[in-house]
Amino acid sequence: MALFERETDEFRPDLASQALSVIAIENDFVANVYDKLASVYDLIFGPILHPGRLVALERIGIVPGDRVLEVGVGTGINASLYPDYCHVTGIDFSSSMLEKARVRIGRKGLSHVRLMQMDAQALKFADDSFDIVYAPYLVNCVPDPVQVVREMRRVCRPGGKIVILNHFRNTSPLLSRLDRALSPLTVHIGFKSDLDLPGFLAQAELRPLSIEKVSVPPLWSLVISTKDLH
């Protein structure tokens, strides 16, 4: 798989992306939050997010030889769920989360999984490098979720799958207000609770094949798209 170093400045979200949430964050803030969460992330978030992870991998339908990029691999909690007949690359911005992932992958002997540290907003891969690009529980954790999807699309091969599993602002007026009110608090445990799904899809120019609520309670959405062939 070809790699290249992209010369980029630290990414700052544009005004359109900022309009998707009441909260604007920077990379250093995100890295600091997740470096602190690394030791307790699996304990706090593992059980409640696990059902969604299982549904996502079932829906993705990985076939032998698939090249999979997991954007936001975190502690590697997904790693053992991937079949050993695919080739998985996991990236994350947090060095502490990646260290947990390296320990887990080494302990389980997952030779089909490799890990790299990088910014999801500036992926250091050549165009069309992967068959599946999957971002679980990530896009409401980054400064510019739209730029993340642009990068996901760029590195996905034509006809490949772009998959997002995430919490988005509730469509109920009451719960939508609650999501917006909570977002300044939830950002300190790693995510913005008020990311707007219709606005996000429009700005990212994603035309989903399917959008499915997953987990109980159904607070998370699985969005599956494909990259155009032309």
Could you say what each language-model-derived stretch is?
Residues 4, 8-63, 77-78, 100, ...:
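Conserved class I S-adenosyl-L-methionine
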Residues 66, 160:
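Glycine-centered, small-residue-biased loops immediately flanking beta-strands
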Residues 132-144:
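A short SAM/SAH-binding and catalytic strip from SAM-dependent methyltransferases
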Residues 222-230:
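C-terminal lobe and adjacent flexible extensions of AdoMet/dcAdoMet transferase-like proteins
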Residues 121-133:
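A short acidic, Gly/Pro-enriched loop at the edge of an enzyme's catalytic core
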Residues 146-158:
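A short glycine-rich, Lys/Arg-flanked "PGG" loop and its adjoining helix->strand segment in the class I
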Residues 28, 45-47, 163-221:
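C-terminal alpha-helical "lid/dimerization" subdomain adjacent to the S-adenosyl-L-methionine
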Residues 69-122:
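Class I SAM-dependent methyltransferase SAM/SAH-binding core
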